[in-house]
Amino acid sequence: MDDLHERAGSTQVEHVHGTLFHFICSECRKDYPDTVDIPTTEVFRAEPPACPYCGAPIRPDIVWFGEMLPQRPWEHSVIAAEQCDVYLVVGTSAVVQPAATLPRIAAHSGAPVIEINPARTPESGLCD
């Protein structure tokens, strides 16, 4: 979501929960890659820009609670979990589904699961 993997040099990243750096129309789903002006100074309240095609607000292309995950990134993430040599779980509560099932998919495929978190999660029992 925050593009930290790309900034670190990763090249095969699947944004299962979307990205804050790509924009879409909240209604017609028109893409607005890198075309939305974002204020560079502190803003206390601002109206989102309107889609010129349907008038609905333009929003970050992220998955909000209750929305479906994007199909292609999800499918690629499942394949990666099935084929990985080791699966790292870092900084998550491991309770938001369906993404929380990925460590279990990796474990069932024979990969060791390593969890790095300040507290135990529902998936801690899978960890080596």
Provide a role label for each language-model segment.
Residues 1-127:
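Conserved catalytic alpha/beta core of Sir2/sirtuin-type deacylases, generalized to analogous enzyme cores
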